[in-house]
Structures are given as structure tokens and as C-alpha cells.
Amino acid sequence: MGVEIETISPGDGRTFPKKGQTCVVHYTGMLQNGKKFDSSRDRNKPFKFRIGKQEVIKGFEEGAAQMSLGQRAKLTCTPDVAYGATGHPGVIPPNATLIFGVELLNLE
């Protein structure tokens, strides 16, 4: 339960997000069956969120906080750190495990 992080390509291994910093990422979100539900890459616009401000689901924040600058990783988020029993109507089914491909581009 929680978030599992699988490194696709390593980052610098030194620069990690700190609470209050803004993470700039590219991501693709998928259901376990591989169906894509969202992607910043499709919009050609990186996504920004602040660590510790609950601006994203818990699993996404917990996973990104453990990534170093430049790292690409696969985050597997169980429902308890995603959208839970409610899901996100029309997009995320109830009790869905979500998979995100994330690249930490910058910290502000």
C-alpha cells in the first residue's frame, strides 16, 4: 500500500524537493490497464505543484519528493494514496491503482 517508485533513468542523486518548493514535472497518468487519463506531455506544458501543500494526490507528492532533479520514474499509487473509494467520476474508477510516468524537470 502506498507509492512504489521504479527509476527509469537516474537524476543527479543530490537535489531533492524540499517542503514548500515547487516541483516542475512532466507526467503521464494511467490506469492499471494502461488507459491514459492525463498527460502534461500531451499539453506540451510542464505541471507545477508545491511540496507539502496537498495540491496533488498523496502518492504523487510522496513519490516526487523522493526523486532527484532530472530523474525519470514510474510511480505506482495504490488507492489509499490516490483517489480511494470515491475515484474521480468519469475519469478514475473507485479503488483504482494509478501509474504515473514522472520526470522531475526543475525545482523553484
Curated annotation (Swiss-Prot):
Inhibited by both FK506 and rapamycin. InterPro entries: FKBP-type_PPIase, PPIase_dom_sf, PPIase_FKBP_dom. It is found in: Cytoplasm; Sarcoplasmic reticulum. Belongs to the FKBP-type PPIase family. FKBP1 subfamily. This is Peptidyl-prolyl cis-trans isomerase FKBP1B. The gene is FKBP1B. It catalyses: [protein]-peptidylproline (omega=180) = [protein]-peptidylproline (omega=0). Its main location: cytoplasm. Keywords: Cytoplasm, Isomerase, Rotamase, Sarcoplasmic reticulum. Identified in a complex composed of RYR2, FKBP1B, PKA catalytic subunit, PRKAR2A, AKAP6, and the protein phosphatases PP2A and PP1. Interacts directly with RYR2. It is an enzyme of class 5 (isomerase). GO terms for biological process: regulation of cardiac muscle contraction by regulation of the release of sequestered calcium ion; regulation of release of sequestered calcium ion into cytosol by sarcoplasmic reticulum; regulation of ryanodine-sensitive calcium-release channel activity. GO terms for cellular component: intracellular membrane-bounded organelle; sarcoplasmic reticulum membrane; terminal cisterna. Residues 20-108 form the PPIase FKBP-type domain. Has the potential to contribute to the immunosuppressive and toxic effects of FK506 and rapamycin. PPIases accelerate the folding of proteins. It catalyzes the cis-trans isomerization of proline imidic peptide bonds in oligopeptides. GO terms for molecular function: peptidyl-prolyl cis-trans isomerase activity. Its EC number is 5.2.1.8.
